[in-house]
Amino acid sequence: MASLASSQTEPNTSESPVPASMFSPEPDGEDSDCSLDGEPLRNGEADIDVTSKFVLVSPSAEQYDSLLHQLRDRMDEGRGETIYVIGQGSDGTEYGLNEADMEASVATVTSMAEQIVADMILLREHQEAGGKVQDYLVRKSVGDNDFLEVRVAVVGNVDAGKSTLLGVLTHGELDNGRGFARQKLFRHKHEIESGRTSSVGNDILGFDNHGQVVNKPDNHGGSLEWTKICEKSSKIITFIDLAGHEKYLKTTVFGMTGHLPDFCMLMVGSNAGIVGMTKEHLGLALALNVPVFVVVTKIDMCPANILQETLKLLQRLLKSPGCRKIPVLVQNKDDVIVTASNFSSERMCPIFQISNVTGENLDLLKMFLNLLSPRSSSREEEPAEFQIDDTYSVPGVGTVVSGTTLRGLIKLNDLLLLGPDPLGNFTSIAVKSIHRKRMPVKEVRGGQTASFALKKIKRSTIRKGMVMVSPRLNPQASWEFEAEILVLHHPTTISPRYQAMVHCGSIRQTATILTMSRDCLRTGDKAIVHFRFIKTPEYLHIDQRLVFREGRTKAVGTITKLLQSTNNLPMNSKPPQQVKMQSTKKSLHGKKDEQSPAAAVTEEASPSAAAIGVTAGAGAMQAQPKTGGGGRRRGGQRHKVKAQGACTASTGGC
């Protein structure tokens, strides 16, 4: 954005927050990134003048078609919605229209919205030098069982008020200051007792086509019926409530990588300030390229000087070289509209100050959430791909998987490939039913979360990290891959054979470093690293983001190359750890036609050993007591040794 770029160095030199008005377009300058009605057209239509603020009053047929084409493009860019400003042009004239011109312009925009089947919501009306200026939210109308979905991850240090804020937003009741609101969200008994979230929670906030909240809790139990909310809503905000405590960091990282949030809401307690895991969670969101906005809570109980100190530290953190954000303090509806329309640039960081007890500024936060547009883009003609982040076994239904549709279109009774299994194979399965937010639907598109009931498959064969893909993709699982990683923190040095947990989408598995482009890695180093999974192969993509962590060690990176596919390996080829584990578990004294995995590997590696037959089997039986650890460690092993000695003597193996 032109105005943002021109002022980039200005706000970074001061400690005061940046006013939101600086991001508004200048009356005498052109700003192609702002949502003006006079935006110059591309695609060879620049000869039709639509830069004047009066073009909407009585447009010609050519101008009307150009404006309609422009609105369609902006709706596509905004994933189904955009902010349209009436009374502003980019031809240098002063802003504002008189009453009659404004009425005619609104009628023109309403006509265009009807053509593209969209609703208009008046956001604000303000007076300028030339008259009135009105801002409208144009949102695409959806069907009865469809809605726009925006996922917001809620992170922050423990006791910052994450669950309390979500309880107030979703249930519409203010908190009593003693944990009343958060009790409605907890899923486990120990969470209710301790007041701390330990699992990934999901809560929804619905907005209708007029921008009003539709959440109405049940009068008796106080619970929310998701089906009724989805039926009334044109837009759903899905909150991913993550744990703030350090010991649940693994769960928080999985929520950020596996649930694919569009935005991240960082919670900061005004009385405690930036402490504990606040910087960790902010760094994680920045590493995954998720836009962040900040909510400062508990302003009703915090002294003014402490609140100002917290805001000053927060602005200093956001402007630091690691973040390079532009903090904007949101204080009124004008600030909300300006920040929401420019938030997708990922440079601006709005800061809200709220109280869950008094309800102060909660209306500004709800308005901002209503204006957020989903960031994920996907075309329906692409091959379908769905990542699994949880599994269930529902009585009377069978196996159910939940997760996120990454791309494409999935319909009822579609045949998909589920995998990879421990051998890297994919199994054909059929979709029995589809639910979105507990509401039955017939199809899901890219960027939407859903649950599928699958036919004729056991829950035990499915794990987190598996995918369901279209057969057109011809999927292949990989044991090894290369990634370019940046070490954010490590106490000493990282060298080959180092093992740590890799988070990549919904995948969460330990991987070993085989080789690196540098001898060793320290904090701040960047290198190309060759990884190998230790347990099962996974389905990966080039340019997929990953988080590499173990204890206090943290690194982020991007996959650059997939090195090895299981389709190119023998069926019995597994990592050495698995082969060794199986060879010690299974006894060699079974039926004569049975063969141990260790013997199978030996036979695969050496054809001569397979030709010898009995002698090779006797040699394997002789070696077994040694690998088992001696006769005294395993019950009854000494008798087996005697039996083996008699067997080898009779066959001449000795």
UniProtKB/Swiss-Prot annotation:
CDD domains: GTPBP1_like, GTPBP_II, GTPBP_III. Residues 156-163 are annotated as: G1. It comes from the Eukaryota. The keyword Nucleotide-binding applies. Residues 1-44, 566-654 are annotated as: Disordered. This is GTP-binding protein 1. Belongs to the TRAFAC class translation factor GTPase superfamily. Classic translation factor GTPase family. GTPBP1 subfamily. Residues 355-357 are annotated as: G5. Residues 297-300 are annotated as: G4. Signal peptide: none annotated. GO terms for molecular function: GTP binding; GTPase activity; translation elongation factor activity. It is found in: Cytoplasm.
